Amino acid sequence: MKKLLVKNIGLLATPEGKSAHRGEEQGKIKFLKDAWVLIEDGIIASVGTGAVPAVEGAEVVDAEGHLVTPGLVDAHTHLIFGGWRQNELGLKLHGASYLDIQNAGGGIQSTTNATRQASEQELAAKASKALDEMMGFGTTTVEAKSGYGLATEHELKALEVIKDLNDHHRMDLVATFMGAHLVPAEYKSNREEYVRLVCEEMMPKVKEQGIAKFCDVFCEADTFTVEESRQVLEAGLKYGLRPKIHADEIEAIGGSQLAGEIGAISAEHLIVCPPEGIASMAKGGVIACLLPATSFNLGAVFAPARDMVKAGVPVAMATDFNPGSCPCLNMQFVINLGCLKYKLEVLTAVTLNGAAAIDLADKVGSVEEGKLGDLVIWDAPDLDYICYRVGSNLAKTVIKRGEIV
């Protein structure tokens, strides 16, 4: 049995439980001073304070009085893609909107072209490098979407890359099928046929492949309508894929309401989510997965998280790592942005609620007996210091499944 004992923890900060926290509960963090954590065979065996137990054969890590939290959970990324889109930055600076760039042949379609041309090996090498960087910032679990293939063989290729990474990289990954990310150029004049392709050709093969756990759709002006999104998500349910939805990022066309109606596990973005959308999500038990780094990168407003918390909607936060609207893979930056608005709830948002948004709250997201031994030792005395030191990487030591990264 492999054992790791983390001792001399100045402050251990963690949410508790195996499900998403909402309302006032989201701000309730357990703090333990002078703490220690014992991990056996990758699983947290015990957590305590005061006298450190003598554990025969254990590797001992001295936290040196620093802060320890759960490993961060990035519950929304577009990890698998070819190319980059730095050329679009100049267009944005000259006033082009996200939809302007997309409608001019840039945006998602540009990345689709590059992704189709890339081999599985090339995509895996690029994504593996990104995962290394993510882990260096304290992320230990990642959701990864397909969605830049937009053709059956290329969507399946992306999901195979995610499986390969999960099998061979230290990071734990959860796969989401997102064939309905955009209507590709070859179907622009026949979007109904593309929706049919996603639902009737891609979905059965995704189920047969057995990698994806969720189905996502981009419900937005100039992408997929509410009814098309409903069609895609209902087809996903038929094939055992739990629904997620990109909603209310640019225009509020009804995506957040649909999330509540269909019982999505999460709705993503929600920058312009209206009150009726918040009410629908609260009623449907939907987790709001907010992406503040995207708002920052787009120069957009931030999602109304406080209204969501007050309404009883659980809030998670993630990077939205992608080559266009948010080439950010640093969850610490997400924390920095979140702390400007959301105070203590941000730790729950980037750990336990993020885990719940990908159906892993029983395994990760808190420092508790029986969960995976995923920890971050921070070069910080407390949570306030992480929020305060904008732009610095304060992850001193990252521990994944009881092993030092």
Where are these regions (language model features)?
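Conserved beta-strand scaffold positions in the cores of enzyme catalytic domains, especially
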Residues: 5, 58-62, 398
